[in-house]
Amino acid sequence: MPIILGIDPGSRVTGYGVIRQTGRHLEYLGSGAIRTSVDDLPTRLKRIYAGVTEIITQFHPDMFAIEQVFMAKNADSALKLGQARGTAIVAAVNHDLPVFEYAARLVKQTVTGIGSADKIQVQDMVTRMLQLSSKPQADAADALAIAITHAHSIQHSLIVAKQSDQKVGSDKEQILALMKTRYSRGRFRLKG
């Protein structure tokens, strides 16, 4: 029953979503956004680090999933996004969490079935998949979609392992070991 923290990084708004996976069932635990003001970038990064650390302390996740960097048209924006991602990853690694990265297109494909889905489609599907009473804000929905993508990746890994007669239970350590094995075969990017 791993708890997965998903992060949608941004230098001004960083979305987060926390779910618990029990087999194929996903349970919503919480979501929201870390908002930074128009302060200088170092202060914003400090707030992102503190916010992610607070979320980790509150929910005690077992795994950390984050969106990969994409090539932006504006180099300055891409650099700031990369710094925000790096800050969130450092917070996770400082809490000994394994870090998994997913491309935005894969996240959208996993949640909506369409790799080019817009934010509203992602919000709608996240709301349905987690049986939420109301739509989460856009950044939180994206973070939940990242966590859902990681949960689906775990489920797929377990199915493949069982089909190849590997003995894998539902123990968190066994799941993590399986995910690392998949990474070593070049199917994932894993840090930590």
Swiss-Prot record:
Binds 2 Mg(2+) ion per subunit. PROSITE patterns: RUVC. The gene is ruvC. The keyword Transport does not apply. Its EC number is 3.1.21.10. It catalyses: Endonucleolytic cleavage at a junction such as a reciprocal single-stranded crossover between two homologous DNA duplexes (Holliday junction). GO terms for molecular function: crossover junction DNA endonuclease activity; DNA binding; magnesium ion binding. Homodimer which binds Holliday junction (HJ) DNA. The HJ becomes 2-fold symmetrical on binding to RuvC with unstacked arms; it has a different conformation from HJ DNA in complex with RuvA. In the full resolvosome a probable DNA-RuvA(4)-RuvB(12)-RuvC(2) complex forms which resolves the HJ. It comes from Actinobacillus pleuropneumoniae serotype 5b (strain L20). The RuvA-RuvB-RuvC complex processes Holliday junction (HJ) DNA during genetic recombination and DNA repair. Endonuclease that resolves HJ intermediates. Cleaves cruciform DNA by making single-stranded nicks across the HJ at symmetrical positions within the homologous arms, yielding a 5'-phosphate and a 3'-hydroxyl group; requires a central core of homology in the junction. The consensus cleavage sequence is 5'-(A/T)TT(C/G)-3'. Cleavage occurs on the 3'-side of the TT dinucleotide at the point of strand exchange. NCBIfam families: ruvC (TIGR00228). This is Crossover junction endodeoxyribonuclease RuvC. Its cofactor is Mg(2+).
